[in-house]
Amino acid sequence: MNLIEQLEREEIERLGKIIPDFSPGDTLVVNVNVVEGDRKRTQAFEGVVIAKRNRGLNSSFIVRKISSGEAVERTFQTYSPLIASMEVKRRGAVRRAKLYYLRDRTGKAARIREKLPARRIQQRSVAAD
């Protein structure tokens, strides 16, 4: 590990942000701090993660949502001080790392299947009678 990577890792630890484990296809709610004049408030942005870029301190992700029939995409820096919190609403089952093809789709064609948790098969101990 070189010096730059070490400095970035220390900075990430210093920030102490709680970032949930999410991936492309997941529906994410990002609470963003918005400053309007002298007021500061939190605005929720809920949408599907279409891309994630893992670059240490420079990591980012793109969230896409449909608002009043218009598609809105917003790029967030993962460790930005403007992000108050993040929450994963639902897991999506996708087979691609970048979901840019969703830009060309509308309505039902743009839906993503939900990833269901794997069922655990319980081992039954057979008692000898």
Curated annotation (Swiss-Prot):
Protein function: This protein is located at the 30S-50S ribosomal subunit interface and may play a role in the structure and function of the aminoacyl-tRNA binding site.
PROSITE patterns: RIBOSOMAL_L19
Protein family membership: Belongs to the bacterial ribosomal protein bL19 family.
Annotated signal sequence range: none
GO terms, biological process: translation
UniProt xrefs under InterPro entries: Ribosomal_bL19, Ribosomal_bL19_CS, Ribosomal_bL19_sf, Translation_prot_SH3-like_sf
Domain of life assignment: Bacteria
Keyword terms of this UniProt record: Ribonucleoprotein, Ribosomal protein
GO molecular function: structural constituent of ribosome
Organism this protein belongs to: Nitrosomonas eutropha (strain DSM 101675 / C91 / Nm57)
Protein's name in the database: Large ribosomal subunit protein bL19
Any single GO CC term annotated in Swiss-Prot or TrEMBL for this entry: cytosolic large ribosomal subunit
